[in-house]
Amino acid sequence: MEEGFRDRAAFIRGAKDIAKEVKKHAAKKVVKGLDRVQDEYSRRSYSRFEEEDDDDDFPAPSDSYYRGEGTQDEEEGGASSDATEGHDEDDEIYEGEYQGIPRAESGGKGERMADGAPLAGVRGGLSDGEGPPGGRGEAQRRKEREELAQQYEAILRECGHGRFQWTLYFVLGLALMADGVEVFVVGFVLPSAEKDMCLSDSNKGMLGLIVYLGMMVGAFLWGGLADRLGRRQCLLISLSVNSVFAFFSSFVQGYGTFLFCRLLSGVGIGGSIPIVFSYFSEFLAQEKRGEHLSWLCMFWMIGGVYAAAMAWAIIPHYGWSFQMGSAYQFHSWRVFVLVCAFPSVFAIGALTTQPESPRFFLENGKHDEAWMVLKQVHDTNMRAKGHPERVFSVTHIKTIHQEDELIEIQSDTGTWYQRWGVRALSLGGQVWGNFLSCFGPEYRRITLMMMGVWFTMSFSYYGLTVWFPDMIRHLQAVDYASRTKVFPGERVEHVTFNFTLENQIHRGGQYFNDKFIGLRLKSVSFEDSLFEECYFEDVTSSNTFFRNCTFINTVFYNTDLFEYKFVNSRLVNSTFLHNKEGCPLDVTGTGEGAYMVYFVSFLGTLAVLPGNIVSALLMDKIGRLRMLAGSSVMSCVSCFFLSFGNSESAMIALLCLFGGVSIASWNALDVLTVGLYPSDKRTTAFGFLNALCKLAAVLGISIFTSFVGITKAAPIPFASAALALGSSLALKLPETRGQVLQ
């Protein structure tokens, strides 16, 4: 028995030695071959190596990427399978063999020479005699990328457009809808939250800007990571961060913690736009890309409509609240914040059913995973179209040469946090290097011009869209002030005031032995008045002040008449007992003004629907650049009419007009950005440009709102000049219509 075992072991060792020698000679012959493509994209025939004219004992296999073109060669080479018993590192079983995945002839782990050097043209290997992997020229890498782009486009056409893309459309639409909701949340809750959190004007301003700052950080962070870790994975993480901190923000009581939660919520949702557009574009064929990316933009509008409708339906219902002592209050506006997290939560659940982008897999040398995803796309669409018998004929997909960038650490090296720290630093270095490559010689001009277009459009758009509601509120305040009633020189004695006084000015009045019980004062001013032996009890006030008044022997019991409401006034022998608890600041709370904010936002977001439809239908017909420049010019012209907006209704109409014509330029800009950068830089560049967009939004909002109530002469020229500059820069960018995705 032992002798038989030894003979068998010796036989196996001998067979392995022979196999190694055969592989060594075959590899030497293959290295001399030419890595070429034979009419790959018109005849769907891909040939990896040319045969030599001399003695060719091992004919090169036909590496065509469709089934049936290399069947004979595969049958001839079937006896030389690597799946042999007792195989070692040089004879590994192909890792996808047991999953039914076609073997990738470039990029496979098992394709090595006997001395350990990779084959020519294989991922990480030599190419056309250029030397070691680190010496591969950028021209060769660009050639590989162009070949992959053409091949990938042909495969997407075979997969078709159908149920899979529409399912992904609605899933990613939820993520984009969550971004649209996030922009409006803080603006809608401020009229109610300012009372609960006792917010000053500076606090409210910071709360309004913190969301944009968070989205700016998130866009750059998640955009860079998505090119290294994957679109789906980073989108799941970013949406999870958004939903978790949006949920927490609805329960926290203090201003600081609420501000922190909204900041991190903005960081989470910041990754939505750059990842969603890049992710969806990599499942769309060239003839469908512009149109369907434009349809996807509609979900941002739907998010704004959803937020406005929920605010209108929830916030005014004060009964939807509860209180635990005087320290914890949960009012209806917190319910609204909670409801606004639903799109993000639903997007997370739906996204778990979707695969990663196959283009990302191919860019990272993961042929097997990419093939399985593309097969899933093909089979899903064919079944939905009633052709389940159609077979996915792709057998080989080209992968890009990969450089060794990751730092591997053995599990027994250092502590776990040291290993994670090194990996995090390595990943951060890769992300930063990828970002800097966007400013390399090949993409520097495009990136700088895109920065100009994104900045100018965002500066004018966000600045004007926030300036519009502020101008409407200013016009409302002017109209309200014009209806103020003035009561000069009145003398009142022994009268009990137990009703509401609103929008009144009392000048030079004298009040003796009067009682103010259960009185509500709203926008009331007492000037140069005398109060002697009066009694104030259970008085609530807003925007009420006593200027240059004198109080003698007067008692204030359970009122909210705090010290700052007495401007240059004298109090002689007057007493304050049991002042009301709560915010000592003067806030307006909810009311007609809050309803107007919801209504204006609802109309403004709904007004972009026609622009969305037109841009989707014409995007692939007239091109991205014409759409972008034309919409920007129309927006610039619409700014001219702002000078004639002197009433509330006129300003609302102009807001709808501006939003309707400017949305097409945003859609075109999103589609253009996706097509200008290659797949390994797409989300990084998109994230950086979107972060710049949020920075411009902060600057635009700060500058434009400072002119509210002063003049319209400054904001309108600013916006018009920015839009004109952006449209002129856009015309100098390359057109991406009719081009395959890089």
UniProtKB/Swiss-Prot annotation:
Membrane-side (Extracellular) residue stretches: 191-205, 255-262, 316-334, 469-598, 648-651, 712
Pfam families: LD_SV2, MFS_1, Sugar_tr
Keyword Magnesium in annotation: no
Mod. after translation: Phosphorylation by CK1 of the N-terminal cytoplasmic domain regulates interaction with SYT1.
Subcellular location: Presynapse; Cytoplasmic vesicle, Secretory vesicle, Synaptic vesicle membrane
Protein's membrane topology: Multi-pass membrane protein
Glycosylation sites noted in the Swiss-Prot or TrEMBL record: N498, N548, N573
Annotated InterPro entries: LD_SV2, MFS, MFS_dom, MFS_sugar_transport-like, MFS_trans_sf, Sugar_transporter_CS, SV2
Gene3D superfamilies, per the entry: E3 ubiquitin-protein ligase SopA, MFS general substrate transporter like domains
Region (Disordered), start-end ranges: 33-144
Biological processes annotated in GO: chemical synaptic transmission; neurotransmitter transport
Superkingdom classification of source: Eukaryota
Family of this protein: Belongs to the major facilitator superfamily.
Stated role: Plays a role in the control of regulated secretion in neural and endocrine cells, enhancing selectively low-frequency neurotransmission. Positively regulates vesicle fusion by maintaining the readily releasable pool of secretory vesicles.
Subunit structure: Interacts with SYT1/synaptotagmin-1 in a calcium-dependent manner. Binds the adapter protein complex AP-2.
UniProt protein name: Synaptic vesicle glycoprotein 2A
Species lineage: Eukaryota, Metazoa, Chordata, Craniata, Vertebrata
